[in-house]
């Protein structure tokens, strides 16, 4: 392998000739051969937005020349275009401040920027610390990159997936308003409900999660940039953070602002804890929805079988013809993973000792993973399951007509205790509810027909 020699304050080190990173990245690569979880590329893109904005801000404040500013912006734009993805090799298991990844970006930007300057005949040179990292610290850049990446992924991936699944349930809700089925509480028969009403509950869960997500993501717009090492802003112009936030906002279209309290921004990640709490809330709702659907679709001959769902693939390697609710199983596993991630994010975010939290990479990794799992999970669940939900009306009607809980409609007319006697007699003697009611002498046949109407029970008002 062809190599070149790079150096840092520790001395010289060999770096692959075809890679744009420098000495500090190479040392991290060698010092932390831990796991397979690489720093998410969206974090790198968040860094690129930041370094781009920092170059523009430093130039505006008279701290960076035109040539250097243009070169750094050029390099950052190449990163944002996805041209340099293979030059960011580090794993998340590194320093808890993300310093190595910050330097990885600084080194790649300086390498590409210097090529740009050389190509344009400039005698200027870009230094990864003195120019690309000017007015910055890893302590304020990594949390800034975290927030930029998280907001973008929520906006472009999670919210569209959530919206599409909600729309599907809304369509099913409207489509099945005329189908009356038996409700169930405690896994036991309850009073009737429309299939559309049941689905409306699922739809509203997602609608509420959209509202929670919209609220919690607002706090992610606060950026730590400008706090530098410990929140005091040492080595940065007082307006630097605000100007960087302005330039990031202009380039992304999102209304980022420099946090009003940098001491908080460096050591606390409560905004991400809140955001992930919303992801957990969504996961719990998706778990419930997926479980309801697979129970309602259980069978086909010995289950509830009130609905059918698409048959996507063979379900068993030994039982011919078996088809399983695999999309529901996938979504419930996604939900469990997100719940586990929430625990990790919460514990890691509680470790802000003094002026800095040093669990940032694992907070970021788990939060992004939850966003991607939820987005991908909802998209494939919607496409391969939810859209294809169909009622099996024969079974729905059989369960409805057999249910003893229709007796609830007699309460206002004969009282709870007499109605309970009718239900128990029917169950014990194998009678229909109507037969038991008439035999009890508490109601006549005409009264039963008048009072026991499932269609009135689902819309009592």
Swiss-Prot record:
Listed GO CC annotations: cytoplasm
Domain of life: Bacteria
Active site per the UniProt annotation: 186, 316
Gene3D superfamilies: Fumarase/aspartase (C-terminal domain), Fumarase/aspartase (Central domain), Fumarase/aspartase (N-terminal domain)
One GO-annotated biological process of the protein: tricarboxylic acid cycle
Pathway: Carbohydrate metabolism; tricarboxylic acid cycle; (S)-malate from fumarate: step 1/1
Keywords: Cytoplasm, Lyase, Tricarboxylic acid cycle
Keyword Transport: no
One Pfam family hit: FumaraseC_C
Main location: cytoplasm
EC assignment: 4.2.1.2
Molecular-function annotations in GO: fumarate hydratase activity
Cytoplasm in keyword set: yes
Catalytic activity: (S)-malate = fumarate + H2O
Residues noted as binding substrate in the record, renumbered to the chain: 97-99, 127-130, 137-139, 185, 317, 322-324
Residues the UniProt record annotates as site (Important for catalytic activity): 329
Localisation per UniProt entry: Cytoplasm
Stored NCBIfam families: fumC_II, PRK12273.1
SUBUNIT field: Homotetramer.
Misc. remarks from the entry: There are 2 substrate-binding sites: the catalytic A site, and the non-catalytic B site that may play a role in the transfer of substrate or product between the active site and the solvent. Alternatively, the B site may bind allosteric effectors.
Protein family: Belongs to the class-II fumarase/aspartase family. Fumarase subfamily.
Function: Involved in the TCA cycle. Catalyzes the stereospecific interconversion of fumarate to L-malate.
Protein name per the record: Fumarate hydratase class II
Lineage of the organism: Bacteria, Bacillati, Bacillota, Bacilli, Bacillales
């Amino acid at each position: 392998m062809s190599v070149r020699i790079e150096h840092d304050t520790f001395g010289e080190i060999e770096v692959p000739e075809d890679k744009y990173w420098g000495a500090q990245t190479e040392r991290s690569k060698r010092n932390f051969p831990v796991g397979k979880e690489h720093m998410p590329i969206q974090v790198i893109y968040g860094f690129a937005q930041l370094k781009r904005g920092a170059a523009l801000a430093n130039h505006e404040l008279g701290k960076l020349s035109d040539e250097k500013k243009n070169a750094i912006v050029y390099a950052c734009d190449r990163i944002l275009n996805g041209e340099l993805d293979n030059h960011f090799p580090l794993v998340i298991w590194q320093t808890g401040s993300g310093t190595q990844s910050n330097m990885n970006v600084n080194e790649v930007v300086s390498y590409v920027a210097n090529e740009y300057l050389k190509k344009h005949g400039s005698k200027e040179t870009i230094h990864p610390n003195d120019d690309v990292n000017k007015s910055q610290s890893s302590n304020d850049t990594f949390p800034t990159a975290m927030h930029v990446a998280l907001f973008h992924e929520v906006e472009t991936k999670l919210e569209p997936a959530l919206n599409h699944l909600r729309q599907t349930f809304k369509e099913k809700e409207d489509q099945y308003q005329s189908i009356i089925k038996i409700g169930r509480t405690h896994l036991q028969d309850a009073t009737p409900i429309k299939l559309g009403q049941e689905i409306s509950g699922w739809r509203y869960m997602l609608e509420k999660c959209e509202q929670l997500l919209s609220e919690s993501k607002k706090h992610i717009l606060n950026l730590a940039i400008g706090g530098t090492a410990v929140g005091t802003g040492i080595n940065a112009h007082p307006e630097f953070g605000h100007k960087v936030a302005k330039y990031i906002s202009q380039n992304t279209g999102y209304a980022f602002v420099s946090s009003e309290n940098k001491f908080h921004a460096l050591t606390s990640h409560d905004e991400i804890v809140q955001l992930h709490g919303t992801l957990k809330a969504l996961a719990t709702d998706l778990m419930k929805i997926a479980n309801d659907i697979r129970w309602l679709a259980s069978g086909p001959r010995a289950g509830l079988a009130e609905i059918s769902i698409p048959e996507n693939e063979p379900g068993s390697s030994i039982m011919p013809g078996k088809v399983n609710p695999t999309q529901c199983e996938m979504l419930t596993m996604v939900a469990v993973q997100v719940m586990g991630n929430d625990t990790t994010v919460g514990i890691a975010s509680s470790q802000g000792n003094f002026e800095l939290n040093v669990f940032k990479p694992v907070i970021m990794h788990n939060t992004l993973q939850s966003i991607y799992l939820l987005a991908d999970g909802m998209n494939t669940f919607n496409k391969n399951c939810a859209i294809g939900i169909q009622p099996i009306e024969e079974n729905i009607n059989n369960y409805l007509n057999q249910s003893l809980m229709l007796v609830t409609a007699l309460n206002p007319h004969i009282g709870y205790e007499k109605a309970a006697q009718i239900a128990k007699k029917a169950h014990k003697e194998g009678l229909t509810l109507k037969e038991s009611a008439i035999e009890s002498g508490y109601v006549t046949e005409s009264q039963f027909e008048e009072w026991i109407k499932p269609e009135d029970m689902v819309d009592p008002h």
